[in-house]
Amino acid sequence: METLFSLPFTVLECPNVKLKKPSWLHMPSAMTVYAVVIVSYFLITGGIIYDVIVEPPSVGSMTDEHGHQRPVAFLAYRVNGQYIMEGLASSFLFTMGGLGFIILDRSNAPNIPKLNRFLLLFIGFVSVLLSFFMARVFMRMKLPGYLMG
């Protein structure tokens, strides 16, 4: 394998380039990287790529039995389609659940006082459980009759 990789370099000569890092470029802090990851996770799980390509409306409308137009936030019976508000709400729940797991992990630090540990555990569990059960409610709204035992 080594001979296979070195074969092109018997003919080609690598240039002697000396690159320096610009002085204004610094390593970002951990919280900056964390914020970028969370925001990108929020946008990707919200379906920003789908929203840009398909350009769905922010909310839909449904005609009730009296002939009145009623706004709806969920595109029912369509797994492969969504309104913008539906994607943002689901994305918020997924991000809240992920942050709940991170809060639960942070509650294991050895130097946290007992009250703060209890509060972190409580907030983490509430975030994870709330996001899980609300995602199930959203699935029930999206696909009526699904997950009905």
From Swiss-Prot:
Residues 54-83, 139-149 are extracellular. One of its GO terms (cellular component) is oligosaccharyltransferase complex. The keyword Repressor does not apply. The chain crosses the membrane at residues 33-53, 84-104, 118-138. It is found in: Membrane. InterPro entries: OligosaccharylTrfase_OST3/OST6, OSTC. Pathway: Protein modification; protein glycosylation. It is a multi-pass membrane protein. GO terms for biological process: protein glycosylation. Keywords: Membrane, Transmembrane, Transmembrane helix. Residues 1-32, 105-117 are cytoplasmic. The keyword Amino-acid biosynthesis does not apply. Its main location: membrane. Specific component of the STT3A-containing form of the oligosaccharyltransferase (OST) complex. Specific component of the STT3A-containing form of the oligosaccharyl transferase (OST) complex that catalyzes the initial transfer of a defined glycan (Glc(3)Man(9)GlcNAc(2) in eukaryotes) from the lipid carrier dolichol-pyrophosphate to an asparagine residue within an Asn-X-Ser/Thr consensus motif in nascent polypeptide chains, the first step in protein N-glycosylation. N-glycosylation occurs cotranslationally and the complex associates with the Sec61 complex at the channel-forming translocon complex that mediates protein translocation across the endoplasmic reticulum (ER). Belongs to the OSTC family. This is Oligosaccharyltransferase complex subunit ostc. It comes from Danio rerio (Zebrafish).
